[in-house]
Amino acid sequence: MERIKELRNLMSQSRTREILTKTTVDHMAIIKKFTSGRQEKNPALRMKWMMAMKYPITADKRITEMIPERNEQGQTLWSKMNDAGSDRVMVSPLAVTWWNRNGPMTNTVHYPKIYKTYFERVERLKHGTFGPVHFRNQVKIRRRVDINPGHADLSAKEAQDVIMEVVFPNEVGARILTSESQLTITKEKKEELQDCKISPLMVAYMLERELVRKTRFLPVAGGTSSVYIEVLHLTQGTCWEQMYTPGGEVRNDDVDQSLIIAARNIVRRAAVSADPLASLLEMCHSTQIGGIRMVDILRQNPTEEQAVDICKAAMGLRISSSFSFGGFTFKRTSGSSVKREEEVLTGNLQTLKIRVHEGYEEFTMVGRRATAILRKATRRLIQLIVSGRDEQSIAEAIIVAMVFSQEDCMIKAVRGDLNFVNRANQRLNPMHQLLRHFQKDAKVLFQNWGVEPIDNVMGMIGILPDMTPSIEMSMRGVRISKMGVDEYSSTERVVVSIDRFLRIRDQRGNVLLSPEEVSETQGTEKLTITYSSSMMWEINGPESVLVNTYQWIIRNWETVKIQWSQNPTMLYNKMEFEPFQSLVPKAIRGQYSGFVRTLFQQMRDVLGTFDTAQIIKLLPFAAAPPKQSRMQFSSFTVNVRGSGMRILVRGNSPVFNYNKATKRLTVLGKDAGTLTEDPDEGTAGVESAVLRGFLILGKEDKRYGPALSINELSNLAKGEKANVLIGQGDVVLVMKRKRDSSILTDSQTATKRIRMAIN
C-alpha cells in the first residue's frame, strides 16, 4: 500500500509526468535490447507503427500488372518507389481489400479436401451441445492426450513417405510404401488432389495433420478422447467446467476404444485356454477392427491400457516401463528396493508367501478416477496423498495402496479364508488375493489401520476410516489433496518379456503386468470387431458357438472327411471343438462322446453306412474325453437359448436341419453353409468320372501313405500309386495311368472295380 501511495504522489507532480512522456530513450542498454538480433522484440508495437505508414506491405513486382494504381475512391494502392534492399514494390493495405473484392477467383474444389480436419472440426462444433457452466474446484491431472481428431495412425516416417509420394511424386529419394494403410491413403489422396493449385508446402502440412497422431501432455479433468481435447479451453478452467457433448465422432477415438475392448476380450479368453500365450497370438493375428488387422493397429497405436499392453508384449513390441496393480498405473519416482520371499500369517492364520519389497520407494499412482503419491518403506506405508473424483474412487486408491504397502496390520485384517481364483480357475497370487478380499469389503482394514491427529496443511485434509473427511484426524499416513497427481509424461518404451501365462516382466524380472490386471468392464465397441478365431466364438453367446462350429466343419469338410477316416483322434482334439463343449451338460458329456465314437467306428467298419450329414452333426460331441458305457441315445441335449434343446441322432431337428436336396445346413434357423461335395450314397458315378486316368488296384495299402482327397490326385505323376478316399468314406488304392489312350474305359471299369476293391 505504501508504495502505491508513493507512486500516486509522484504522478501528481507535473515534472514526473513530463520526464516519463517526453524524455528520449538514449540509454545504450535499452537501444541494444530493442535492436539486436532478427527476432522482433515488440511485435504489437511494430505492427502498429508499420500499419500507420502508407505502404507497409511489400509485394512481387508482377502485382502492378494485376492491380490498378488507384481504387474506385481514387486512393493509391501501390507506390512507384522500390522497397529498399529488394526488387519488390511497396503496397498499401487498401490493395489487399481490392484484391479480396476484385481479384481472380480460383477453383475452390480442393479446399474441403486439403483442410479436411478443419472443415470436420467446424461440423463437430456446429452439431455439438454446450450445457451449463458449473463452478467447482477442478482436479486436473496432466495426461498424455491426442490433440488432433480425425487422424490415421501412421508413424512419422510412414507419413513422411506418403506425403512425399503424394505432394512431390517426382522428387528423388527412396520411398517404400509397405503397410496397407500407406498404400490406401496414397492412392486416395493422389486422386483427390489432381490439378490442385494450393501450395505444396501447405498441402504437406495439412496431410501431416491427417496422418499422424499428435499428443501433448495437458491438464485434463474430464474426457480424454480427441473430440473433447479440441474444446478443452471451452470446457474447463481453474474453477469452472462446462458440460459439452461432441457433435460427431472421429475414427481415431473409435479405433482406440474398440482396440481396448478387443484386447480385453482376447486376454480374458486366452487366460482360460490351455496355452494362453499361443492362443492370444492366434487371436490377435486373426482379428480385425473396423476392417484393419488388429496386429497392424497394435504396431501403430500408442494407447496404454493393461490388455492392449499385454497384446503388444506378446507381439514383441516395447511397452511403457510403469507397472499395474489394482487397476492403477504405478511409476517409481525415487528410491529402490530388493525383493525377498517372506511367509506371513493372515488374521485367519492362513500362511501366505509374498514377495516383499525391501527399501524406501516413492511412487505415483494414476487411475481413471483417482490419483495418488505413495511413499513407503519395507512393509510400511509412510505417506499416501490421494485425490479423486468422489468418495468411492478415493477409497479404491487407498485400498490398493494399503495392500501394496504389505503392512502387517493389513494382512492381519483378513477375515476368513483367501481362495480367489482367476477365470481359468487357478488360485490368484497372494497380493491379488489380498486385493480382491479388501475390494469386497475394506471395513476391517480401515478400522485396524489406526488414526492420527493432523496438522493444518494448505490444500490437504484428513480422511476417517468411514471415509468421511476431517480436519482434525486422519487414517495413519493418509491425506486427501485437492490437487491431482500428474500421469507419467515420458513416452519411453522398454523391452519386456512375456511368459506363457501372459505375465510381463521388465529386464530386471519385475512383474509389470498380468491378466489379473485386465479390467472386467464390458463396453460396446464403436467399430466392428471381427474375431475369426474359434476361441472367440463364445463371445456372442451359445448360439454363435453352435452355428460357428458347424460352419467350420462344412467349410473344411474335405480335410475333416479324410481325418475322420484316417486319424480320428487328431480330429477330435481340434481346438475348434473346444467352445462347443461348454454347451453340452457336463454330467453326460463323456457318455455322449463314447457313444458317438463307437458309432463312427462302426461306420468305418461296415461299408455303405457312411452318412455325411450324421457325421457333421455328431462330430463335435466326440471331442470330449469319452466314457465307455452301454447307454444308447436317440437325441443329445445342448444348452442354448436358456434351456436344453435337442439334436436328434438320426434325423433333423430345429437345432440341426440338413436339407439333402439343396445340401444346405441350417442351425437354429440360421444358415450354416452349403456342402460342396455330394453327400448322397450314390456317388459311384461321380467318382468314376473323376477317377478317369487312374487304375483302381484294390483295397487301401498303408505303404502308400495317408489317403488323399479326389482333388489331390491331380498332383500324382504317371505310374505313381496312392490311396484315395471316395465318397462313401472308403479308401482304395489307385495308380495314375502311364498312357492317356485308355482313359475312356476307366469310367466304366472304375465303378465295377470300386465295388470289387471294397468287397
Swiss-Prot record:
Keywords: Cap snatching, Eukaryotic host gene expression shutoff by virus, Eukaryotic host transcription shutoff by virus, Host gene expression shutoff by virus, Host mitochondrion, Host nucleus, Host-virus interaction, Inhibition of host innate immune response by virus, Inhibition of host MAVS by virus, Inhibition of host RLR pathway by virus, Inhibition of host RNA polymerase II by virus, mRNA capping, mRNA processing, Viral immunoevasion, Viral transcription, Virion. The keyword S-adenosyl-L-methionine does not apply. One of its GO terms (biological process) is cap snatching. InterPro entries: Flu_PB2_2nd, Flu_PB2_6th, Flu_PB2_C, Flu_PB2_CAP-bd, Flu_PB2_middle, Flu_PB2_N, INV_PB2, PB2_helical. The record marks K627 as: Mammalian adaptation. Gene3D superfamilies: Polymerase Basic Protein 2, C-terminal domain. Its main location: virion. GO terms for molecular function: RNA binding; RNA-directed RNA polymerase activity. One of its GO terms (cellular component) is virion component. Influenza RNA polymerase is composed of three subunits: PB1, PB2 and PA. Interacts (via N-terminus) with PB1 (via C-terminus). Interacts with nucleoprotein NP (via N-terminus). Interacts (via N-terminus) with host MAVS (via N-terminus); this interaction inhibits host innate immune response. Plays an essential role in transcription initiation and cap-stealing mechanism, in which cellular capped pre-mRNAs are used to generate primers for viral transcription. Recognizes and binds the 7-methylguanosine-containing cap of the target pre-RNA which is subsequently cleaved after 10-13 nucleotides by the viral protein PA. Plays a role in the initiation of the viral genome replication and modulates the activity of the ribonucleoprotein (RNP) complex. This is Polymerase basic protein 2. The gene is PB2.
